[in-house]
Amino acid sequence: MQYSFTEKKRIRKSFAKRPIVHQVPFLLATQLESFSTFLQADVLAAQRKPEGLQAAFTSVFPIVSHNGFARLEFVSYALSAPAFNIKECQQRGLTYCSALRAKVRLVILDKESPNKPVVKEVKEQEVYMGEMPLMTPTGSFVINGTERVIVSQLHRSPGVFFEHDKGKTHSSGKLLFSARIIPYRGSWLDFEFDPKDILYFRVDRRRKMPVTILLKAIGLTPEQILANFFVFDNFTLMDEGAQLEFVPERLRGEVARFDITDRDGKVIVQKDKRINAKHIRDLEAAKTKFISVPEDYLLGRVLAKNVVDGDTGEVIASANDEVTESVLEKLREAGIKDIQTLYTNDLDQGPYISSTLRVDETTDRTAARIAIYRMMRPGEPPTEEAVEALFNRLFYSEEAYDLSKVGRMKFNRRVSRDEITGPMTLQDDDILATIKILVELRNGKGEVDDIDHLGNRRVRCVGELAENQFRAGLVRVERAVKERLGQAESENLMPHDLINSKPISSAIREFFGSSQLSQFMDQTNPLSEITHKRRVSALGPGGLTRERAGFEVRDVHPTHYGRVCPIETPEGPNIGLINSLALYAHLNEYGFLETPYRKVVDSKVTDQIDYLSAIEEGRYMIAQANAAIDENGQLIDELVSSREAGETMMVTPDRIQYMDVAPSQIVSVAASLIPFLEHDDANRALMGSNMQRQAVPCLRPEKPVVGTGIERTCAVDSGTTVQAFRGGVVDYVDAGRIVIRVNDDEAVAGEVGVDIYNLIKYTRSNQNTNINQRPIVKMGDKVSRGDVLADGASTDLGELALGQNMLIAFMPWNGYNFEDSILISEKVVADDRYTSIHIEELNVVARDTKLGPEEITRDISNLAEVQLGRLDESGIVYIGAEVEAGDVLVGKVTPKGETQLTPEEKLLRAIFGEKASDVKDTSLRVPSGMSGTVIDVQVFTREGIQRDKRAQQIIDDELKRYRLDLNDQLRIVEGDAFQRLARMLVGKVANGGPKKLAKGTKIDQAYLEDLDHYHWFDIRLADDEAAAQLEAIKNSIEEKRHQFDLAFEEKRKKLTQGDELPPGVLKMVKVYLAVKRRLQPGDKMAGRHGNKGVVSKIVPIEDMPYMADGRPADVVLNPLGVPSRMNVGQVLEVHLGWAAKGLGWRIGEMLQRQAKIEEMRVFLTKIYNDSGRQEDLESFTDEEILELAKNLREGVPFATPVFDGATEEEMGKMLDLAFPDDIAEQLGMNPSKNQVRLYDGRTGEMFERRVTLGYMHYLKLHHLVDDKMHARSTGPYSLVTQQPLGGKAQFGGQRFGEMEVWALEAYGASYVLQEMLTVKSDDVNGRTKVYENLVKGDHVIDAGMPESFNVLVKEIRSLGIDIDLDRN
């Protein structure tokens, strides 16, 4: 088994019973693949597939002018390299994007050419099409300096859907069937039955019309319509009565209205008897061809065809007319014998289309189209061209209607056609096929569709959403281009004169900047990033709205299995509308979610893995991943638990066709991180999944001792860690960068064999948490491609580490853990276990005002030197300064208008020429309730404005850092080159050289070492080939130097050019403060099982309950939090965590007494290979075993995968191994070793009962009391009511509401009440009066009229009622 460099340092013992069949796919693949398909940036223009940008361009181009003599054709597009890299964009507040240029060709035809068109001239040119945001390697976008994510959308797939109203519309509870054809873009077409069984259609939810109007509009006559939907009965008229052609099926179940006889006149069915199968057999046996029917049997039947008098050509009766006595009379007169009527019955052949034809008043195709025109454009006169154009545009024009590849596939599958491709617009037979199925449904044949089935909902990813926006922009451009194309020839225009890129840029900018699906990335920790990118939302444009979404849409559906997580979804109004992709889910070419299954052939599980969509899955019998199989892959059990079409059942192995790949396949990333998930209630698991995303990265991340084995995948795929791009040797490492000398076999010829990784240091995330990377390799380490070189936020040795492992005791403690409160030891705070660093960004801008420019300066009047003490000469705070609320960070003055001066001021001015009062102090200060350390300052200056010293110094530092990188690369390149050179030169014969090298001398190592490296090139060699090689190496080194100099120059140019700032801004300063947040009462904490609580008290270490060996518990939780919540997973985690730590202590004890390596190996083998997944410890060297043991001292990390975790027996074994009987006895453990005797820290007495004690991975959540605590003295007031504002952000007050007033009234506290409602709130004069009185030392309240009363009076007056206050 292969272990990576980091895995060897600390192996996670897995309890999984099943081998890994299928690796978890790259977790951000959906986003990255979708966007790369959209851009196709690295594909040659000629080889691009018709998708993404290419599809958008080809669908709009060529654009032809109105007269048809000029057209603009699309040739290809290209994306330039981005001007700034990701980091620079974040710092400068820019969008990380690249310029999109399209090569277009303007073709002008010769108007004079008499016959076929002749090309007169062709102009080709590259045209700028706007900026296209680029995706970062981690699947996000940088828009205006902030990272955003485009969330995928789950929407109803295009195609045709059949449903009924579940009997809700009509009072009788009758099912009304309907069908809807949904295109990808274009008009929706609905068909629906009304309670009277008449079939209507409507376009885009407008007024409904009989469906036969649509059928006539597509060119069918009433005869053809009836022929399409009915079978006919054939009658031959006799002088009296008629003969009916006998069709057995049509008679079965009917009641005979007359005696039915055979040819000989023998009665087979008596009148008023129901015709059964025996009667039919008798009739068939008698070879009955016709049945004689009486006259009244014909009456009321409906004619299928027009009946025309052969001699006169007169229409006697039309199709769909009822047969009456007069009609029969006319027919006999005209000598017509054969007539056809519609066969209908009440059971499975309803007369719906026939009834609809009767309601329809239109007569022919034109009238039908006019009726549709009137419905679509009421009030407009229907001219012939307009009517035709509108109808064709509705469903037949490719510009206006697009069913899309998916829609066509879904449509054809639903109407049972074999081929899944076809035209992208609606065809006449599509409309007919839909109506036929709908009528069949009404007749009781077939099933309606389930719209929540994942086969009917598809995912639109970034690429597709961006393509739709881009196409919308292009269509806007198309209209403008059409106008101008007419003038292209006369005014000699070039392509760039025709195309204006503004509409495209604005469409793209709007989508990425403010669409509902473009969201501010949740960056609290690596898990929240991954989850955000894997989110699937049913909301957004073209999706559902919160208010309208019912229970069904939100509910878990059987087809979610392995595609969408049934657990992870937000609590609240969005529940079930926002979901997360399951671990192995993947999108197929049509955008439907697929999940992998192992193929089973003859009850033997093969290694073949097939991805099945929800529709395909319904056809197979699928076994669960935990079905027992032997070593040959044969299913052992007589009955296997399996699923077919969403139903679970027990079946014999020979019926199984597929099997799940992994037990964790049904849940999402966050849910699969919860150990013992199978023992938690689903509601609590949902909270646990959601709260892990809110865990704040701790100062020192600590791996969970009980994990699920997916922690490493999460950390690596999130992009928080640094991975080796190529293998090699670590050449240099410090806190800020890692330099790797690449292996020769991985280095590319002519390229620097050096990889430099600059680590991210103390950077602010979107949620103000700290992102910081720490190297975990040492100089000289050999690393392979993909190894973890540095840990990021919330990762420990390349594993996700969201919280800390706490020693937890389940017991009550003086009521301090009442109602989920948490009691914590002071030691936890003192050790900085939950201390987190938060980085705040504070901005100040100097603008150009009407009165003159604002100035950033240290020279501010009326400020004491103490307040300016932390500013440098430019007026900007030093890095490293510790600041409190109200301290000045950046000094800034703003000019203010001339004010009326007092005589004293005039005198002072005359004497001293004092001009200071022209400016007011608008410095940037630390906001209230914040304090911290300044860790970074950035200064941005507009082009053409003198930089201050500080800005210059920042640029110099940046260049120095860059030069260091380049020097390192050069050092390694030269080192390699000179090593190769030395190997080549030693032993060669020289013709001369420096230090008087004689001709014919053999060069040796000593001579070379004596020379300066660069003088080696002056040696003249006798061997011409070697001399040429020497020259080549010299050239390659010089070439590299030249390249590095160019790169440095490029960087310098980028840094020294002015910054792009918003209009009117001259200078902008950003100050970054690092705020250290210790754990304190009021902070919210949680485990991974939805067991959340608030810290109630931090107890001195000596008061905490402690074990017999003196070790105190870290956290005391209430045992009552477990039973009713049904999240027993937390108790199991505590037991297993206790074993993990116990094993760690035993390993630590071995290391302390310097036990033999062999003893260590035996013990580690016992831990790793007695149960669960086997580890290959044989391949480890003694040094590696020693390093592994050192890392295991703090606890042997366990993995208990979801639904495949540790059993009770295995946990017992581990506890026995961790706590031998002597230790167990000393600690007073129970026989199963999961409960311990504890002593009260305050009295030293032993508690009456043993206590469940162990280690749990506990998180601190991003709901910190510091961010929520707030107190107001005097602050802003609302403009109209003059009442204080509310909320911390507005520095608002506390609302004193209706009920609080009642409380004071109840106590009769009249003065308190008066004060609350007047001077403390909105009595403007009273407020100032109280202030004056307080200054004078007089504590009297003069309450006046509250402003809200005046507002009330004004509002009543606005109703036209004259109301006035009688002040007497």
UniProtKB/Swiss-Prot annotation:
Task: Name the catalysed reactions.
Answer: RNA(n) + a ribonucleoside 5'-triphosphate = RNA(n+1) + diphosphate
EC number(s) given by UniProt: 2.7.7.6
Q: InterPro entries, alphabetically?
A: DNA-dir_RNA_pol_bsu_ext_1_sf, DNA-dir_RNA_pol_bsu_external_1, DNA-dir_RNA_pol_su2, DNA-dir_RNAP_su2_dom, DNA-dir_RNAP_su2_hyb_sf, RNA_pol_bsu_bac, RNA_pol_bsu_CS, RNA_pol_bsu_protrusion
List, in alphabetical order, the GO biological process terms annotated in this UniProt record. DNA-templated transcription
Q: Which UniProt keywords apply?
A: DNA-directed RNA polymerase, Nucleotidyltransferase, Transcription, Transferase
* An example molecular function term from Gene Ontology annotations: ribonucleoside binding
Entry's Gene Ontology cellular component terms: DNA-directed RNA polymerase complex
The record's section on PROSITE patterns has: RNA_POL_BETA
Q: Which PANTHER family match?
A: DNA-DIRECTED RNA POLYMERASE I SUBUNIT 2
Q: Subunit details for this protein?
A: The RNAP catalytic core consists of 2 alpha, 1 beta, 1 beta' and 1 omega subunit. When a sigma factor is associated with the core the holoenzyme is formed, which can initiate transcription.
Summary of the function given for this chain in its UniProt record: DNA-dependent RNA polymerase catalyzes the transcription of DNA into RNA using the four ribonucleoside triphosphates as substrates.
- Family indicated by similarity: Belongs to the RNA polymerase beta chain family.
- By its UniProt entry, which HAMAP family does this protein fall under? RNApol_bact_RpoB
**What is the protein name stated in its UniProt record?**
DNA-directed RNA polymerase subunit beta
Source species of the chain: Burkholderia lata (strain ATCC 17760 / DSM 23089 / LMG 22485 / NCIMB 9086 / R18194 / 383)
Taxonomic lineage of the native organism: Bacteria, Pseudomonadati, Pseudomonadota, Betaproteobacteria, Burkholderiales
